[in-house]
């Protein structure tokens, strides 16, 4: 049966609408943003927590925030996406509206403005990308350009990159990230409904239920990289990088190694973290991996058919353990994290406690509770320094700071 994500709030909080029009708004108002302050969730970890390595510093409160990102090399700016279709810029203790596309964004079900990503050459080309769910339910990637100063979006700069029709209210995916190879990666859900009724995840002719890898063109649209694993295969979409995914809502690249880690939201019993090791830090992982859905849910057999050479997850969290919708995170890389440096931090929408583990192709070591809790944890984010943030749909954006 269909997992009751709506009860956990994500279904009614993560819907974004997109239209094919190319105009954009850049907003004008600005106001003072709160300075970072200790959050109650960070200063008072849950009793019995296995580690007390971080505290949570509140960056600010927002209207249903969904993600945090920063341009490469820019330590002065952080950007927060809000579900309704706005991007808020944080700079020098103040906030301003960087983009407002709320008229395009569907906000029911698991929709909304879900993430953003900055082009590796953003400092010179000012190109950035957003992932949202359009008013007709389509999964949409749009490109915009910032002004030369980088504090607003250029009016009329919007260009459609990719649009994928989606038939149902759930499993909308939502993540955008540029990999170490300079290509744009996006995670698309399987099309929704219980058990992948359309069998999209194992179908190489469909983009739903996939991780895709594309090279966005400056004027809109995209190229398919020649190195993608299914380029030239009859009946397969060349954009596909990995398949067999249910709802890859959050994924990230390790900024030190290039390894790719995917949080794939489960169905009835199992939430999973998938790990794709990098060939090199500069190239990222090799493509073509089958992650098993809907033949497998985690390591457990789920549906009919076969999943050739599928790769099992490195972490499983069951619903019996209090999980309901896993939220993939980031590998902690700044030296300031001390003993936690090199650990992967992740969480879950229902079980709000943060967790850490050391990941490799062989599995996970030391998977444990970190201590602080974040209610309605919908995302993690990373700034230009590699510092990691937790995002609560209740409004809080919190930086994970070393304790002591």
Language model features by range: what are they?
Residues 18-20:
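C-terminal motif of bacterial Sec signal peptides marking the signal peptidase cleavage site
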Residues 245, 363-384:
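Conserved blade-ending motifs and adjacent loop-strand segments that build the rim/top face
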């Amino acid at each position: 049966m269909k997992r009751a994500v709506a009860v956990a709030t994500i279904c009614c909080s993560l819907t974004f609408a997109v239209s094919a029009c190319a105009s954009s708004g850049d907003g004008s108002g600005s106001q003072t943003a709160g300075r970072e302050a200790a959050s109650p969730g960070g200063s008072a970890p849950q009793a019995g927590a296995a580690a007390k390595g971080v505290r949570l510093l509140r960056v600010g409160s927002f209207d249903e925030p969904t993600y945090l990102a920063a341009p490469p090399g820019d330590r002065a700016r952080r950007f927060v996406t809000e579900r309704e279709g706005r991007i808020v810029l944080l700079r020098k203790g103040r906030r301003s509206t960087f983009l407002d596309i709320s008229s395009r964004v569907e906000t029911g079900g698991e929709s909304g403005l879900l993430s953003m990503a900055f082009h590796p050459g953003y400092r010179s080309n000012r190109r950035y990308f957003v992932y949202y769910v359009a008013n007709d339910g389509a999964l949409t990637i749009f490109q915009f350009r910032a002004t030369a100063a980088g504090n607003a979006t250029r009016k009329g700069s919007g260009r459609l990159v990719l649009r994928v029709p989606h038939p149902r209210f759930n499993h909308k995916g939502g993540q955008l990230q540029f990999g170490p190879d300079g290509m744009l990666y996006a995670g698309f859900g399987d099309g929704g409904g219980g058990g992948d009724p359309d069998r999209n995840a194992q179908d190489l002719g469909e983009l739903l239920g996939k991780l895709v890898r594309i090279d966005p063109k400056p004027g809109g649209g995209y190229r398919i990289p020649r190195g993608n694993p299914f380029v030239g295969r009859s009946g397969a979409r060349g954009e596909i990088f990995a398949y067999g995914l249910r709802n890859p809502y959050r994924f990230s690249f390790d900024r030190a190694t290039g390894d790719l880690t995917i949080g794939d939201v489960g169905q009835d019993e199992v939430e999973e973290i998938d790990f794709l090791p990098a060939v090199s830090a500069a190239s990222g992982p090799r493509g073509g991996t089958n992650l098993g859905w809907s033949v497998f849910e985690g390591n457990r057999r789920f549906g009919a058919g076969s999943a050739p050479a599928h790769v099992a997850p490195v972490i499983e969290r069951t619903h019996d353990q209090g999980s309901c919708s896993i939220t993939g995170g980031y590998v902690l890389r700044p030296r300031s994290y001390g003993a936690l440096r090199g650990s992967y931090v992740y969480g879950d929408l229902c079980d709000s406690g943060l967790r850490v583990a050391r990941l490799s192709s062989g599995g996970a070591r030391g998977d444990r509770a970190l201590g602080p809790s974040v209610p309605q944890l919908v995302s993690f984010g990373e700034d230009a320094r590699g510092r990691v943030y937790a995002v609560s749909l209740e409004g809080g954006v919190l930086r994970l700071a070393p304790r002591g």
